[in-house]
Amino acid sequence: MDIETSGRVVRFHRPAVEWPTVGLSLVIFGGWGALTFWHAIIPWPLLTLGGGWFVAWHMSLQHEVLHGHPTRHRRVNDAIGFPPLTLWLPYMIYRRNHLRHHRNEHLTDPLEDPETYYLTPERFGRLGPAARAFLRFRNTFFGRITFGAWRGMALFLWVHLGLCLRGNRAELRIWAPHLVGVAVVLAWVCGVCHMSLWMYVLCFVIPSRSLASIRSFAEH
């Protein structure tokens, strides 16, 4: 790979396998597996912190693998990103939407960013006082990690499951394997580890979305 910097072309040789990222993947899956397996002896505040951390960490790892890491083989990378530890977010939808955002001329346009919270002054001005107050709260740090996180999950499911119910074949082709993956995750969590679904959602899924919202708060 050739990279141009300050008028000079620097040749960069990318390794066939980026072993630090492979090692990080093992840490993430191992940590998640350990927390779920021994959840009964872990105080719930620590379980919530650790569960949210490892699932959010996997979401960050998904961002790396969709950009071609840690190997040169897409199928291997996708296999690392695919496991639906969040339950609600299909990796292939995240991959499709994120790469679509990177492949157009609107990369830095806040209105086109799939993670944007931006409203034009004209649109904001048409809102009533209550709506403006709510949006100001949502754009605070606390608002992002609480209501913003929950709203994001609910809105995502509303839109994409609605497409499935209307027979959108592209969505169905993504959600079918995703639901199989969810079944495997829950077979481990509920069947092997004997953790209730509600505990997994409260201690892993929701906290991970809140942690992931911190990045979007800093960027948007």
Where are these regions (language model features)?
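Residue-level signal for transmembrane alpha-helical positions in Major Facilitator Superfamily
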Residues: 27, 54-61, 76, 206, ...
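Residue-level micro-sites within transmembrane alpha helices that shape
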Residues: 17-20, 62-63, 77, 177, ...
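Acidic (Asp/Glu-rich) catalytic motifs at the cytosolic membrane interface
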Residues: 55-74, 94-107, 215, 219-220
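Extended hydrophobic/aromatic segments used for targeting, binding, or gating
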Residues: 203-219
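Single-residue recognition of alpha-helix capping/boundary positions
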Residues: 75-76, 131
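Non-catalytic, topology-defining segments of multipass membrane proteins
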Residues: 1-54, 84-202
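Select transmembrane alpha-helical segments in multipass membrane proteins
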Residues: 76-83
